[in-house]
């Protein structure tokens, strides 16, 4: 098949496309954001340029499949005017669907989005486990079992809330614990993807998102789990009962206490690290995710 991935949210299209190419498909990725392009690659399109837009719509006519990541705004409207006879797969990633509604068959990247898409299917975020097994991601030469002082523990933290200070449930706690020399905070921000993975791999704990209105987590947390790191994050009771991810669960109210407990509990960290990497292999492998994607293409093809 000739497949166009439109957008590349969190590099997910890149991971899927790599596996699709192995299977013999002809695949291209079109991106519209310079940061995403610098991190994950793809064909950069200046969507503000009328000529670039015209050229994009002309180019993608050649593809059988339009796999559209983060369907939103004027691009979504323009594609839907032109998608006749195409396998047009909408793949939602969060704010593009949350609080809205889509009755079509589609894919969603987190299970909380299923409430907004009654005919949707959850596609677990693919994690390139093979990439992480490379030499540069091997575990640092540090033996946690002989560490008696918690100040040696490094905590990976992605301050995603930088532009939304009202959702910063972390900084006060992290500054306090660092000042008390209970841990070292490693901010994962504005790094090329490979460097970000290396930084996470040098840490002992990954702090994930606390999103009470969402109740789930994203690729950053999954990559930490794939690297064998214990992850602390918020997972709603509703979603935990169904999916039971190996996450050290916390809330915005209990975050400080929960993080201190995790810092103190070596056996729990080891358990979560082991179970987390197994969880990724079982549910987030590139092969299993790409199989679901192909089944989705086939389903939409029969519906055309």
Where are the regions that the model predicts?
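A charged, aromatic-enriched C-terminal amphipathic alpha-helix characteristic of glycosyltransferases
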Residues: 264-298
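Donor nucleotide-sugar binding/catalytic pocket of nucleotide-sugar-dependent glycosyltransferases
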Residues: 104-143
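Acidic donor-binding loop of glycosyltransferase active sites
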Residues: 201-213, 229
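Short His-centered aromatic/hydrophobic patch
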Residues: 68-74
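Short hydrophobic beta-strand element within catalytic cores of glycosyltransferases
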Residues: 226-233
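Active-site proximal beta-strand in glycosyltransferases
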Residues: 65-67, 81-99, 104-109, 121-126
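Conserved catalytic-core segment of nucleotide-activated headgroup transferases in glycan assembly
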Residues: 128-196
């Amino acid at each position: 098949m000739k497949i166009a991935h439109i957008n590349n949210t969190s590099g997910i299209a890149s991971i899927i496309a790599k596996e699709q190419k192995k299977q013999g498909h002809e695949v291209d990725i079109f991106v519209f954001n310079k940061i995403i392009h610098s991190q994950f690659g793809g064909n950069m399109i200046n969507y503000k340029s009328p000529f670039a837009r015209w050229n994009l719509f002309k180019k993608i006519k050649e593809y059988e499949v339009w796999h559209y990541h983060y369907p939103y705004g004027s691009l979504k409207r323009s594609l839907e005017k032109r998608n006749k006879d195409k396998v047009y797969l909408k793949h939602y990633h969060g704010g593009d669907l949350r609080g809205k509604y889509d009755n079509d068959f589609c894919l969603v990247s987190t299970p909380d989005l299923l409430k907004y898409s009654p005919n949707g299917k959850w596609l677990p975020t693919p994690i390139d486990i093979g990439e992480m097994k490379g030499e540069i991601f091997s575990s640092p030469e540090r033996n946690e079992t002989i560490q008696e002082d918690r100040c040696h523990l490094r905590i990976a933290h992605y301050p995603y809330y930088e532009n939304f200070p009202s959702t910063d449930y972390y900084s006060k706690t992290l500054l306090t614990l660092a000042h008390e020399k209970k841990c070292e905070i490693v901010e994962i921000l504005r790094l090329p993807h490979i460097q970000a993975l290396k930084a996470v791999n040098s840490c002992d704990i990954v702090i994930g998102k606390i999103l009470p209105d969402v109740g789930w987590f994203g690729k950053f947390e999954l990559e930490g789990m794939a690297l064998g790191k214990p992850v602390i994050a918020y997972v709603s009771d509703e979603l935990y009962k169904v999916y039971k991810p190996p996450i050290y669960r916390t809330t915005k109210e209990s975050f400080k206490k929960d993080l201190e407990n995790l810092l103190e509990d070596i056996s729990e960290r080891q358990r979560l690290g082991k179970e987390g990497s197994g969880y990724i292999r079982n549910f987030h492998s590139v092969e299993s995710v790409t199989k679901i994607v192909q089944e989705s293409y086939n389903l939409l093809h029969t519906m055309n």
